[in-house]
Amino acid sequence: MCPYTRAVGASIDVLRRVVLFSGLKDKQLKRIAEAMAERTFAAGEEITKEGEISVGFFVIEDGRARVTMSGDEVGQLGPGDHFGEIALIAETPRAATVTAETELRCHGMTSWDFRALVERNGEIAWEILASTARKLYENAERARGTPTRFPA
């Protein structure tokens, strides 16, 4: 992973849309945003590669990226979109390749920076755990064919 440069973090509104952070209060989201660093990718540069372990989470500030799986394009990303949140808490292979289509300016965070943040801020860790449990419950209910919402 290339080095990050410290800059003003991602916007709270963008972070609020990240499922992992959906239960956090603005004050907690601000702490995460402030811990993020700016990163720029050149057009054509691969940011993540399908099947490889990687440790970065990114929020796109400016530019466009292409998402591919098994070589087939499955999506486009632009300002306000994010990817890689699973990498913050689990060292699992990337599900897709993300390639910058234009120069891409992102705010990013590594898993070790995220871990340090949640170790210092237990309430953030607890809210993320609760949010993850709700999502697991919803997924299990959907798999059973009973789309019941778990109370927030």
Where are these regions (language model features)?
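Cytosolic regulatory regions built on CNB/CRP/Popeye-like sensor folds
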Residues: 1-152
